[in-house]
Amino acid sequence: MPPKSATNATSRRAEVLEAALELLADEGYAGASLRKLAARLGMAQPSLYHYFRTKEDLVEQVLATYAGQMFQALSPDQLPTTLEDVPRVTVETAVRVYQRPTHPLFVRVAISVSRVNPRFGTLMRRVFVEQATWGIQQMMKPFVERGEIDADDAVDLVRMLLNAIGLRLIEDKVMFAAHEPGPDFDRYVRFVIATGHAQLAALAAQRD
């Protein structure tokens, strides 16, 4: 068990980063400042220098932290065990990620800052393209190795599913005034999963 002081420090850092995320989501990069963050937290601004020295450091830590949480959404015991499971597991995982109150805020911040500074854009490309592709490849590796699907098709399939459900969730929770998905959301989820199954069937037919 970690010492109580270490646990308290970890908890305090998480509190600071969540407040920073909310500030960036509310006011954007231009409107956010360490002074405003300190005011939200009820602490002296110099105390924030224990966590980050500049606003750029703040943004990078926020992006890295919440990107890490996003990738932790699918635990090893939840991985699909059959190719047929892939569409359902992929879509359900994306929906579950957006059920975290902080994730829509993270996506809003990631989109808004990616063009502000090249270092933020590079970090977000690494997260949403390079790391995401690597994660997809690892999830699909057993099926590729068994010859059930080509490597490129495996990545394209999962990306198609993630983009289809992700854009709908961005519309509901990020781009416009946040609101719960409409009554057609469950139908849309079923449609996306069924489309994934149809694509798997089409790919299998091409291989026969």
What would you call each of these model-derived segments?
Residues 1-11, 22, 175, 204-208:
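N-terminal intrinsically disordered/low-complexity leader segments
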Residues 61, 74-107, 151-161, 186-189, ...:
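Hydrophobic alpha-helical connector segments
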Residues 64-70:
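Short, basic, alpha-helical segments at the C-terminal edge of helix-turn-helix-like DNA-binding modules
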Residues 53-57, 61, 98, 115, ...:
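Residues in soluble alpha-helical coiled-coils and helical-bundle/repeat scaffolds
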Residues 15, 19-57, 61:
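Helix-turn-helix
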